[in-house]
């Protein structure tokens, strides 16, 4: 294993998937171009460089930071000679080495991405709730299983989260808020451990009970499950929002309650973005924002549909960023093209 590979793997442990994946991907791309040239030309210009094949890091490309790192996608075609490519690899080595030296004693923190058996989330350690939770649903995965019981599940903290940043059950006790699921328990009944994991407090957020979590939010969750009868596959991203409000002085403020000794944030709103893939491979998107307040059950869910971009701006995230908007056939039930 080369020094640069060790550095990249070290970075993967400290910086998270996104940055390390970019470094390794960029390095691997140039290595492939270089090896192809050597094979074709018989050159041994880097015979003294011990570069081994490594699998790429799995990247979770469906949700990303709103300001992505710029990468030249035409880099391969611009590098016209083997020598230039060797130089490029050396520059990547220097880049990763310098970063490693600067951050020798660790990064203060990056998004904590947690992959469970049947869903993935990004945990917000400051607010003690998730930034987003991502699910993949289809008709087969939602088939009822008599051996699966919600009554066996217990709300519990995720031990993988540092104790400084966890929410605990006592934070919710007496708060007046429900421990509201982001990845709905009803979406994960194909195995007991799948539904069990939806009860980790990392998947919870303080939600108003009567009129919201137990009613209108539940209606939205049931609607999403219904979509598995319409689409071949359904992809769901759910999370909290903390939206500004105009106050008496005419200025906008972001104000939200915190509960418990761990100061768990109470979101002002929740979003849910859904992409359905049809049997003929068309993609359709729906986006919802609901206030964390009691909602009349007679209000149609379509009243809460919003442009997806409005959620992205408010959340500081780009959702389904591997899908160009012009590839969608419908957004919120309306034809895009």
Task: Describe every region a protein language model picked out.
Residues 1-337:
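Domain-level detector for secreted/extracellular nuclease and nuclease-toxin modules, and
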